[in-house]
Amino acid sequence: MAKLQQLVQAIQSGTIKTELPDVRVGDLVRIGVSIQEGNKQRIQPFEGTVISKHQAGANSTVTVRKSLQGIGVERVFPLYAPCVANLQVLRRAQVSRAKLYYLRSRTGKATRLKEKFETLPQIWMNQNQH
C-alpha cells in the first residue's frame, strides 16, 4: 500500500502547478478555459466569485459563480487541469465563511461582498497552451 501511495504522489507532483496564484473564497477571478472547436482552439473567459474551494492536491477545484441576465451560473473548475489556460485574481473580499453558498439565494446588489484592499497576485498563464 505504501508503494501505491508513493506512486500516486510521484504522478501528482508532476501535474501540480506551483506558480498558480493564491485563490481564496470570496475572490473575483477570471479563468480562461481552453475550448477545442473542430480544429480551432480558443480561450473562453469565465469571470465570477469563488464560492467554494476544495483542496485535494492535484484534484483541487474551485466553484465560481456569476450572474448572467439575472440567472445564476455556477461552474466547477479543476485547478490543475490542462483546460485551464490562465487564472487572474481581480479583487479580494472580506469573508468569514469557508463556503459562500448563501449567495445562491441572493440576487442583484445583495450578492456584493465587502472588498479587501491588498496586493493581488500576478496573472497566471499555462505555458503548455502556447
From Swiss-Prot:
Name this polypeptide is given: Large ribosomal subunit protein bL19c
HAMAP family xrefs: Ribosomal_bL19 (MF_00402)
PANTHER family, A to Z: LARGE RIBOSOMAL SUBUNIT PROTEIN BL19M, RIBOSOMAL PROTEIN L19
UniProt-listed PROSITE patterns: RIBOSOMAL_L19
A GO cellular component entry from the record: chloroplast
Keyword Mitochondrion: no
One Pfam assignment: Ribosomal_L19
Coarse class of the protein's main subcellular location: plastid
GO molecular function annotations of the record: structural constituent of ribosome
Organism, as annotated: Chlorella vulgaris (Green alga)
SUPFAM superfamilies documented for this protein: Translation proteins SH3-like domain (SSF50104)
GO biological process: translation
Intracellular or extracellular location(s): Plastid, Chloroplast
Family the entry assigns: Belongs to the bacterial ribosomal protein bL19 family.
Keyword line: Chloroplast, Plastid, Ribonucleoprotein, Ribosomal protein
Keyword Ribonucleoprotein: yes
